[in-house]
Amino acid sequence: MYILGINCAYHESSVALVKVIGNNWKLISFVEEERFNRKKRAKPALIDNCDVLPHQSLEWTLERAGINMEDIAHVATSMNPEKRQKQNTEHDHGYEIEANGFGTIEGEEKFYKSTKNIEKKFRGLGFIGQFHFLNHHDCHSASSYYVSGFTDAVS
């Protein structure tokens, strides 16, 4: 089974591919889009470009593994749009924020829609497996634990 991780909600767009056989998780590849487009951080972090996929990283990863989108069982992105929208709109920030930007109701709605569009874009590329929106910081832990070979760890 193949699991593809994608980070594209902000900057530093990247793709990671893991192959899972039983309890053995093997990292096949990890690559950041900036290695292909030669732009530091790959893209600007804007309120409405969360769904700009790292296409060159994705193509390179699939080619390197010798697989197609149909071979991937799960795609996970390191952004949970529901959690983020709730966290960023239900309290006073205590500082001035730009109108229609990050942290405003209007801006967070744009961010939410753009983030939710990531799955649609993957479906358009032929992905037929399960899509997951995960909590960002949990992804940091998972990315090191599951491929570590350890059966027990503190994160």
Where are these regions (language model features)?
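Short acidic/glycine-rich loops and adjacent helix/strand connectors
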Residues: M1-S155
